[in-house]
Amino acid sequence: MNIDVKVIAGARRREMRLEGSRLLVKVLSKPLKGRANEELIEYISEILGVKRRDVAIVAGERDPRKVVSIPIDEEALRKRLAER
């Protein structure tokens, strides 16, 4: 599934939650040399329990608003976020 993601880079702590149909993800890394994007992919795979190689940024590589491809459906996404 593709999901809209808003990334807040340089946050004090990592966080992931749904805001409507958009996933809000806070990462510690600054948006320099792709570090925040790498942390985003790593964090999504860790929290959702999917392989890192199966998570990809489809659009918005250099924008805080991104489209990310993840190999689970919306119901599973909501369930995994609620379990945290």
Model-derived features: positions:
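Residue-level signal for inorganic ion chemistry
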Residues: 5, 44, 55
